[in-house]
A protein has these predicted regions:
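Short loop/turn segments immediately following beta-strands, especially the blade-tip
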Residues: 24-31, 70-77, 115-125, 172-181, ...
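Beta-rich catalytic cores
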Residues: 17, 44-46, 90, 143, ...
Length: 347
């Protein structure tokens, strides 16, 4: 058996149908998901991460200012430990450092990365550091949407959408494992209104791929882990040239083989696939696929190599088989009903 922890939206302001942080038991032989727990603590347990030993889980509560910690029990269900208020509005992403010392949270309207101390019992402690993306005017911020480690967990890539009062950008930040503070080593500014959203790092730690939400683009960057420098090399559309309707790029992943990049698009409800040149890192589109649902806000690869898409507005998680030789997605017809899913973490 394996397990999946599914975050969701729960509030009427989000027109959500989610009930809470859900735990599913997965039969590895049949692929069937069984709901074993739905934990109701704070609203909108939207994005999650685990500690390095997979004994604890941490969740942000989207649209609010809170972050929660949970112990993963022997039966893989969750026990709530504590919830803290970090002050920054709308935490949207969360990760943990390689020493299990600090939890890092990105806040959208807060425009700030928060470093939170992690106690010995796995619960959350005080905020140890804060790093803010300045806006166009004093008192304004650039809205951060992700905090992503490089493969060595020495640098953090943090995308900011910018929106009206800020600057659309992605920064590379060197991390101090001792203090939990960040030092900028590189910065990329996007075109106005393109809104950088999420990035993914190739296993070789030299190539980074970033999707822009409103620009509907995927960009390729070269990254130097010795200096922290990065350089934009290429951009491609995440939707076919025949698509003229509204679309928002939402998630980007490198497949487990390191051969392909995938990007999901909301409203056009599709997944774009790109082959990675194994020598140069440049991308070439190989196809577009229906996500078989509405609003694919999130997708990821499970340990078994299957791709799971969280379709927020159709209340489903859809399983696909991914052929790493051809880059094709094949629906398995395994569809898991769950309210307003926006994140999946496997254990």
């Amino acid at each position: 058996m394996s397990y999946a922890y599914v975050g969701c939206r729960t509030t009427k302001e989000r027109n959500a149908r989610g009930k809470g942080l859900c735990v599913y038991e997965i039969n590895d032989q049949t692929g069937v998901w069984k709901l074993v727990q739905c934990l109701k603590t704070e609203p909108n347990p939207s994005y999650q991460t685990m500690d390095q030993e997979k004994k604890f889980l941490y969740s942000v509560h989207g649209d609010f200012t809170k972050v929660s910690s949970y112990q993963i029990l022997a039966d893989h269900t969750l026990k709530h430990l504590n919830t803290i208020d970090i002050g920054g509005k709308n935490p949207v992403d969360i990760t943990i450092d390689k020493e299990n010392k600090h939890v890092i949270v990105a806040t959208l309207q807060g425009g700030t990365l928060y470093t939170i101390e992690r106690k010995e019992d796995g619960s959350l402690g005080d905020v140890a550091a804060a790093y803010t993306y300045e806006g166009k005017e004093e008192g304004k911020v650039s809205t951060i949407h992700q905090c992503l480690w490089d493969q060595r967990k020495n640098y953090l890539f943090a995308c900011a959408q910018g929106r009206i009062n800020g600057y659309g950008q992605m920064r590379a930040l060197r991390y101090s494992h001792e203090t939990g503070t960040f030092t900028q080593t590189a910065q990329f500014f996007a075109r106005t209104w393109d809104e950088p959203r999420h990035a993914a790092v190739h296993p070789n730690n030299r190539w980074v791929y970033m999707c822009e939400e409103k620009g509907n683009k995927v960009l390729y960057f070269q990254f130097d882990e010795k200096t922290g420098a990065m350089e934009a090399m290429q951009e491609l559309s995440t939707v076919p040239e025949t698509i003229t309707s509204y679309s928002d790029a939402s998630e980007v992943c490198v497949d487990p083989s390191g051969r392909y990049v995938l990007v999901s698009n909301r409203y056009t409800d599709s997944i774009a696939v790109y082959r990675i040149d194994p020598v140069t890192g440049y991308l070439k589109n190989t196809g577009f696929y229906s996500c078989l649902g509405k609003t694919p806000r999130f997708f990821c690869f499970a340990p078994n190599g299957r791709c799971f898409v969280a379709n927020e507005d159709s209340d489903t998680i859809v399983e696909f088989e991914f052929d790493s030789a051809t880059g094709q997605l094949f629906p398995t017809l395994n569809i898991i009903p769950t309210g307003s899913p926006v994140c999946i973490v496997f254990a």
